[in-house]
Regions:
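Extreme N-terminal starter segment of soluble prokaryotic enzymes
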Residues: 3-7
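Short N-terminal targeting/anchoring amphipathic segment
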Residues: 86-100
Length: 100
């Protein structure tokens, strides 16, 4: 039996952030409905829309397991480099890379 498809997703904001509205809600809904069949790895920013700083308790620049089992990488501003993006893309074989 084959494992779940591995999906790497890039989105500017993801939960717990919400001020960006629709795109965040759409990604949360996608994970909610497909997490039993798909392994999501989500790369996102470390602060909410229009926020000048990130929450002090947020774990940045590492994979964090969220409530539906999805892995989330909250990228700090200084960590959003082409080198880091390339590293995340090439660290494993993804079945799909989804850029939202």
């Amino acid at each position: 039996m084959m494992g779940k498809p591995q999906v790497l997703t890039f989105i500017d904001w993801y939960k717990p952030f919400y001020k960006a509205g629709g795109p965040v809600r759409s990604m949360v809904n996608l994970v909610d409905h497909l997490s039993d069949r798909v392994d999501f790895h989500i790369v996102t920013g470390d602060r909410d829309y229009t926020a000048s700083s990130s929450p002090s308790d947020l774990r940045r620049d590492q994979w964090v397991t969220s409530d539906r089992g999805e892995q989330v990488w909250y990228a700090a501003l200084k960590g959003r480099t082409m080198g880091r993006l390339k590293q995340l893309i090439t660290e494993r074989k993804w079945d799909v890379v989804y850029i939202n």
